[in-house]
UniProtKB/Swiss-Prot annotation:
Its main location: secreted. Potently inhibits platelet aggregation induced by ADP (IC(50)=157 nM, complete inhibition at 514 nM). Also inhibits platelet aggregation induced by collagen and by the thrombin receptor peptide SFLLRNP. Is a potent antagonist of the fibrinogen receptor glycoprotein IIb-IIIa (ITGA2B/ITGB3) and the vitronectin receptor alpha-v/beta-3 (ITGAV/ITGB3). GO terms for cellular component: extracellular region. It comes from Dermacentor variabilis. This is Variabilin.
């Protein structure tokens, strides 16, 4: 599976710039307590 506009909530890795770029738009890290280094894409400012 890949990061794409068709998978807006697809998990992304917040540990590197390359990984963030792979998310397509922007990667937001999960709040503390969730998977370390994990995140999700944000589209149009919406989570």
């Amino acid at each position: 599976n890949t990061f794409s506009d068709e998978n807006p909530g697809f998990p992304c890795d917040c540990t590197s710039a390359d990984a963030k770029r792979a998310c397509g738009i922007q990667c937001a890290c999960w709040p503390r307590g969730d998977t370390p280094g994990g995140g999700r894409r944000i589209i149009d400012g919406q989570q």
